Every structure is written in C-alpha cells, then in structure tokens.
UniProtKB/Swiss-Prot annotation:
Protein name (Swiss-Prot/TrEMBL): E3 ubiquitin-protein ligase RNF220
Catalyzed reactions per annotation: S-ubiquitinyl-[E2 ubiquitin-conjugating enzyme]-L-cysteine + [acceptor protein]-L-lysine = [E2 ubiquitin-conjugating enzyme]-L-cysteine + N(6)-ubiquitinyl-[acceptor protein]-L-lysine
Cross-link Glycyl lysine isopeptide (Lys-Gly) (interchain with G-Cter in SUMO2) per UniProt, renumbered positions: 277
Coiled-coil annotated residue ranges, if any: 485-513
Annotated spans, Required for targeting to the cytoplasm: 514-522
GO cellular component: cytoplasm; nuclear lamina; nucleus
C-alpha cells in the first residue's frame, strides 16, 4: 500500500516537486548546469527506487535510466555537509528522504525542503506559514541588476511589471549599503542566492543578476505610459531623460507664443480668448497633442493677423480718401463762412444799432439789439430778390402749322343740321352767323352731289324712319331723276361723272369703307387729334351737330381736318 501510494503521488501533478513548475527556477537550474565545472566530481546516477527487500513487482515511475535524479536535479559535487561547490542551494530540492540520494544534505532551513512543503509536509503553525515566501512569485526586488555608474532601484510585482526608480544613491553612502544588505538578507531567506553567490565577488554577482533579470523580464517588456512605446530595460533611463526634456520644453514654447501674442497692436479680446483657451486646456492631455495644438493655433493666429492687417489697410485707405474729401469741403466752407462773416461784420459795423428819431429824440431800434434781427427773433422775412423772368415762349393755342400745314377747313365749311323745331334752327343759325362774322357760307358740298337724301340727320324712331325710308332716294336714283329734269348737257355731264365714280370704285375694289355712311370713301379726311378717317361729308355734318369725333368722341375742330389720299 505504501508503494502504491507513493507511486500515485509521484504520478499526480499535485504531488510533484513544486519548484519545477516555476520558470524562474528552471532558468536558474539550466544556468547552473551550463556554468558548472566538468572537473567537479559527480555522484553516480541513481534511479528512483524502493528498498531491495520488496519482492512484489509494482509500477514505480522514473524507473528508466534516463529519468535519473541527476537528470532532473543537477548533480551535487563536493564533500557531503559542505555547500561550497553547489550550483544552487539544496533548499530548492523538494524530495522526500526516501527518494533523495544518500549524499544529499537537506538540513538547511528553507521553505522548499521536505520539512516545509510537499505531500509529506507536517502541519505547521500560522506564524510559520505567514513568515514563508512563495516560490511561485518573482522576487520583490533584485539587487545589483544595474550598471555601477548609474545605480537604480528596480522593483517588479507579481504580474511581471518592472518599476524603475531613478534615485541616484552613491555606492559609498549608508543608504546604498543598507539597501545591499537588506536585499542580500531577503534573497538569502527566500533561497534565491546560493552560498557561492554570497561568497563570490561583486562583479560575478552583477553578471549573474543581469542574466537572471533578463530572463525574468524578457517575457514582458515595459511600455512608456506617455507615448506608449515598447522599451527595453537598457533604454528606460535614456527614454526617461527624453521625456523630461520634452516636458521642460513645453513651458518655453507656451511662453514664446504668449510673447508673440503680446506684440503691439494685438487687441485685448484676442489676448483674453488666448488666456481662456490656455486655462480651458485639459490637464490630462499628452504633451505631444498639446504641442501640435499649439503649432496649429500659432498657424491660425498668423493667418488671422495677416487677414486683419489687409482689412485694416483697405479700411484705412477708404477712410483717408473720405478725410481728404471732408478736408477739402471744410476748407471751401471755411472760406465761404469767412467771407460771409466779413460781410456780416461790415454790415453790423455800419448798422450796428439802428437809430431813429421820435419826438425830437434819438432812439435805438429794438430789433437791432437781437442777434440776427427779425430772422433771429423768429419772424419770417421775405427776400428782396426777384426771380428772373424766363424768356421761353408758352404755346397755349397749340399751333400745328409747322407740323401739319395750314388748316384746310374752317367753320364756314361745316354743314349745319336742321332741327325739328323752328326755334332751335333759328338759334343755330344765329350762332353760326356770330362765328362766321357775317361771312358767306362755303359751297364745298352742294345738295345736288350730297350723299344724304335730305338735310336732316337720320332719326332713330321707327315711324319717322319708315317715312324717311319711303321718301329717301339713293344717290343713283336722285342723279337719274335730276338728269331727266335738266337739259341734255347736264345729263351728259352727270353720266360722265357717274362713269368716273364707277371706274374709281372698280379700281379701288371697295377695299375701304367709311364707318359713318358704310360706303366707299368719296373724299377721305382725317383728324390730327385722333387720326380717324371718314368721308368729307360725314365729317362736316357731324361737326355741324357737335364738335366731337363720330367714332371716339374726341373734341375736334374744323381746322383739325386734313385731306388724305388712299
């Protein structure tokens, strides 16, 4: 049962030696194997086994020759009981006495021996457990892992992050000695410093610590928290100096921008806005982003200054022109005012106080005491200047002789209309005689060649129109009757006139008709007032009744009629 239990515990991962699971210890073991001198006597490889007295075959692990104790845990040299030639302390070996070789001494007090931890570890008190250091976490602090020229303190936490503190401690100071002693004590207790390391020279310890630190910290390189750049341990100091230089340059750049902004001619509003912008900047902004923002702001500010200067130049040019104009006008007004003042002064000197006699006494007129006289007192004074007369001729009658020629018709040519009542006819005859001044009436149109059958105007009543239609005769019938009544000579002349009229009608084709008689134009006349065209008889009869155009009722006089030829 004991052998089975031992084999089960050896196969189970939880009962294997715990230091094998730590990569740091494996690196230390490989380093010790490589640096070990071949001249050191080695013990005979001894496989794991059981007492010889056991006769029963049991499945025991690591019975093969390749899985020897020396291959798993490096061979120990030297005389038993001494630790001068060991590559790493025996406290790192976690084996039960029954699996350990006879010459292995596990007596030193350590946290990794069989009396401290393991499958066969006895129960310990709480104080003992708390005083032990875990072998699964890297050391809290490494000693002599830096150059002797620039000593630093480097710390690493359980996650593998390294913290470099640039505190310069001289090697001869008490602080450095205290740190070295404390570090040696801590690492000696934790079992990470062998006796040979403690007794060797400082140069050897520095080399070994550099190798161990590189092996420990190569798995996770540090990153700059400002610019997020992946750094090596050897580059930390140089990068920190660069960041400090950039941080020192930021206030100088801001001061230079402020000096540029304080140049003469800068308005207060811009300075206020710049100060507000600087106050409103986020304190958590990175230096690189703030530097780029300042550069962009300076470029924008320079552009603004250039645009403002150009605008002010244009405005000043316009204002200068306006000022010159105002100065010229002011000089002119000043000269005029000076002349007026001189005239007023002379006038006031001559008539400063107007005097007049009253009852043998001289008195001063009160209005002369007022500044400006009546005008200054508020009274309206009429100027003695007379407006110049204009020599332009005013045409009231509207003489159109130059444009349309001499009048061709007069009031004597108008054909008067006969009224139905004899009283109205007498009044019209009297008015006509007054207009003609006793002159004879015109004989342009005789009743023989008139288009109208009688002298009366056409009536709109039905009864009278029927009677007139019965009595009316056309121009052709009347001509025929007159021809029959007259002699043969007159008849012959009338026929010739009729033939000529018919020929004219045939030649014209009756394309134009008068709107009054609805017949072809016998002698067309037009008015220079409205330019309407009617027959001569139609115009004269219409003007005899009223002085209006029969088509548009425009006031028309007989002198406005002109003969036209179609």
């Amino acid at each position: 049962m004991d052998l089975h239990r031992a084999a089960f515990k050896m196969e189970n991962s939880s009962y294997l030696p715990n230091p094998l699971a730590s990569p740091a210890l494996m690196v230390l073991a490989s380093t010790a194997e490589a640096s070990r001198d071949a001249s050191i006597p080695c013990q005979q490889p001894r496989p794991f086994g059981v007492p010889v007295s056991v006769d029963k075959d049991v499945h025991i692990p690591f019975t093969n020759g390749s899985y020897t104790f020396a291959s798993m845990y490096h061979r120990q040299g030297g005389v038993p009981g001494t630790f001068a030639n060991r590559d790493f302390p025996p406290s790192l070996l976690h084996l039960h006495p029954q699996f350990a070789p006879p010459n292995l001494d596990c007596t030193p007090i350590s946290m990794l021996n069989h009396s401290g931890v393991g499958a066969f570890r006895p129960f310990a008190s709480t104080e003992d457990r708390e005083s032990y250091q875990s072998a699964f976490t890297p050391a809290k602090r490494l000693k002599n892992c830096h150059d002797t020229e620039s000593p630093h303190l480097r710390f690493s936490d359980a996650d593998g992050k390294e913290y470099d503190f640039g505190t310069q401690l001289p090697s001869s100071s008490p602080g450095s000695l205290k740190v070295d002693d404390t570090g040696k004590k801590i690492f000696a207790v934790s079992g990470l410093i062998s006796d040979r390391e403690a007794s060797s020279s400082p140069e050897d310890r520095n080399d070994r610590c550099k190798k161990k630190a590189a092996a420990l910290f190569d798995s996770q390189a540090p990153i700059c928290p400002i610019c997020q750049v992946l750094l090596r341990p050897s580059e930390l100091q140089e990068h920190m100096e660069q960041e400090l230089e950039q941080l020192a340059q930021l206030p100088s750049s801001k001061n230079s921008l402020l000096k540029d902004a304080m140049a003469p001619g800068t308005p207060k509003s811009l300075l206020l806005s710049a100060s507000i912008k600087r106050e409103g900047e986020s304190p958590t902004a990175s230096p690189h982003s703030s530097a780029t923002d300042d550069l962009h702001h300076s470029d924008r500010y320079q552009t603004f200054l250039r645009v403002r200067a150009n605008r002010q130049t244009r405005l000043n040019a316009r204002i200068g022109k306006m000022k010159r104009r105002k100065q010229d006008e002011g000089q002119r007004e000043g000269s005029c005012m000076a002349e007026d003042d001189a005239v007023d002064i002379e006038h006031e000197n001559n008539n400063r106080f107007e005097e007049y006699g009253w009852c043998g006494q001289k008195r001063i007129r009160a209005t002369t005491l007022l500044e400006g006289g009546f005008r200054g007192s508020g009274f309206i004074m009429c100027s003695g200047k007379e407006n110049p007369d204009s020599d332009a001729d005013l045409d009231v009658d509207g003489d159109d002789t130059l444009e349309y020629g001499k009048p061709q018709y007069t009031e004597a040519d108008v054909i008067p209309c006969t009224g139905e009542e004899p009283g109205e006819a007498k009044e019209r005859e009297a008015l006509r005689g007054a207009v003609l001044n006793g002159g004879p009436p015109s004989t342009r149109i005789t009743p023989e060649f008139s288009k109208w059958a009688n002298d009366e105007m056409p009536s709109t009543s039905n009864g009278e129109s029927s009677k007139q239609e019965a009595m009316q005769k056309t121009c052709k019938n009347s001509d025929i009757e007159k021809i029959t009544e007259d002699s043969a000579v007159t008849t012959f002349e009338a026929l010739k006139a009729r033939v000529r009229e018919l020929e004219r009608q045939l030649s014209r084709g009756d394309r134009y008709k008068c709107l009054i008689c609805m017949d072809s134009y016998s002698m067309p006349l037009t008015s220079i007032q409205c330019w309407h065209v009617h027959c001569e008889e139609c115009w004269l009869r219409t003007l005899g009744a009223k002085k209006l155009c029969p088509q548009c009722n425009t006031i028309t006089a007989p002198g406005d009629l002109r003969r036209i030829y179609l």
